[in-house]
């Protein structure tokens, strides 16, 4: 059964930037004689969250409050500095559609690459099904993504990222990156993914969206949980949610 457990989790960033988690950077620093202690900033501060099947959790807060960073911790992109993280179930992190894509590769090869990164076997049937969803000309599969317009590129990346259901779905804002002629179809596909997932966590500035779609809202500020607002459903519709009243 899908489950997320975070207990007293902290994440410290090197002060010179989050990208410097790399081993290469550390080795170069040592060769340059910069082996002293690195100054850090605490991005996630002592956070505990428990979620089981049926949970729809919204992450709210101002820019820099830690919403996106917390999603990346849960997805395994960043290692926690301290605390305990336990994830049970298949995780789909929709945090950046272009992550892992190579614009110099042809479209079909990019689809296969992205599927492998997500742990899926890119069979011909699966690639063809993904391509059919994009509604793009069949011949474009053999063109490098660099030749695609931004709208066409997003169609390919969106169709690939959302091709399979997941136990745990992580969303950094509600996806609205596809062109206008494709948006309704993409919205329905995303809603289906959300309904199929056992646990959904979405970070957003849109309070109305969170209140409409979530069972609880976790309010963050400076990497800390300020409070958690519980909500409940009064409708058979999966998104017919409203706040509990005392």
Labelled PLM ranges:
Residues 212-219:
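Conserved catalytic segment of ABC-fold P-loop ATPases
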Residues 38-40, 90, 95-156, 160-168, ...:
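ABC-family P-loop ATPase nucleotide-binding domains
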Residues 5-7, 11-14, 53-58, 62-118:
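ABC ATPase nucleotide-binding domain signature region
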Residues 2-42, 237-244:
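Pre-NBD coupling/linker segments of ABC/ABC-like ATPases
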């Amino acid at each position: 059964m899908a489950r997320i457990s975070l207990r007293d989790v902290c994440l410290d960033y090197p002060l010179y930037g989050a990208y410097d988690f790399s081993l290469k950077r550390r080795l170069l620093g040592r060769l340059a004689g910069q082996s002293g202690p690195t100054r850090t900033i605490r991005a996630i501060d002592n956070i505990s969250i428990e979620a089981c099947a049926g949970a729809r959790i919204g992450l709210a807060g101002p820019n820099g409050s830690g919403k996106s960073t917390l999603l990346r911790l849960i997805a395994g992109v960043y290692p926690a500095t301290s605390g305990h993280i336990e994830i049970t179930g298949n995780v789909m992190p929709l945090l950046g559609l272009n992550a892992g894509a190579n614009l110099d590769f042809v479209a079909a090869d990019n689809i296969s690459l992205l599927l492998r990164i997500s742990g899926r076997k890119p069979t011909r049937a699966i690639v063809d099904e993904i391509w059919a969803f994009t509604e793009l000309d069949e011949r474009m599969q053999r063109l490098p993504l660099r030749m695609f317009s931004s709208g066409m590129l997003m169609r390919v990346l969106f169709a690939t990222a959302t091709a399979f259901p997941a136990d745990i779905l992580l969303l950094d804002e509600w996806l609205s990156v596809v062109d206008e002629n494709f948006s309704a179809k993409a919205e329905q596909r995303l809603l289906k993914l959300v309904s199929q997932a056992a646990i959904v966590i979405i970070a957003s500035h849109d309070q109305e969206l969170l209140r409409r779609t979530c069972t609880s809202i976790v309010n963050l500020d400076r990497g800390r949980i300020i409070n958690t607002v519980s909500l409940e459903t009064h409708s058979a519709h999966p998104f017919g949610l409203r706040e509990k009243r005392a």
